[in-house]
Structure formats: structure tokens, C-alpha cells
Amino acid sequence: MAQRYQNIMVAIDGSKEADLAFVKGVHSALRNDAKLTIAHVIDTRALQSVSTFDAEVYEELQVDAESLMKEYEKRAKDAGVADVHIVIEMGNPKTLLARAIPDAEEVDLILVGAT
């Protein structure tokens, strides 16, 4: 018997590989009638110090992430996915995408690109 998924998470970073994972995620969500969680993590490790991480930098990163995610949300809904959820977090992508977000969102399948 084939595995059925209820909540599929796709990690998006703007790369071509992530876009390919997104397409597979949309197809999997449609095939399983599943919720599609689209996750993006703003990598704060690249910021050198707390002083460089001011409100303006935060706002710009957040606005860019929201714009990217709205685009993916629209694509998923246009493809026919009924339940689409967006998650934007700041921090270490490895820990957030592998553990924190999937646990919080009760994800049972994670799709990521090779970037």
C-alpha cells in the first residue's frame, strides 16, 4: 500500500533546485489531497554581528521573503492545491527546516532542493 501524506513541506530559497522541489511538492499535495506548507528560512548566520542586524536590514529581508513566498503560494493555489500554508522564519536553515518547522507544522514529508 502506498504511503499517504497529509502535510507536505517544501523548503524554498529562490534557487532553481528549490523550484523543482516545489513542483514535485505541488504534484504530491494534489495526488494526496494534502496540505502544502511552503517554508523559507532567512539565514541570519551570514550577519557578522548583532549591530549589523538593524531594523532596516530585518525589514528588507522580511519583505523580500514575503514577496517570494506570496509568488509560490499563488502558483500552488493556481495549480489546484486547496490548503497552502506559508512559513517564514529567521535563523539557521538546517535546524529550522529539519526539525523545528516540521515539528511545529506536523509535517510528514519534507522536500528540498540540492542547494
Residue ranges of model-derived segments:
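Structural beta-alpha unit
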Residues: 1-3, 74-110
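A generic structural signal for short
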Residues: 13-14, 60-61, 86
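Conserved donor sugar-nucleotide recognition element shared by glycan-biosynthetic enzymes
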Residues: 18, 65-68, 93
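Short, hinge-like loop/turn segments at secondary-structure boundaries
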Residues: 53-57, 102-105
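A short acidic, glycine-rich active-site loop
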Residues: 55-67
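A conserved short alpha-helical segment within the catalytic HATPase_c
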Residues: 69-73
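Short secondary-structure boundary segments
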Residues: 113-115
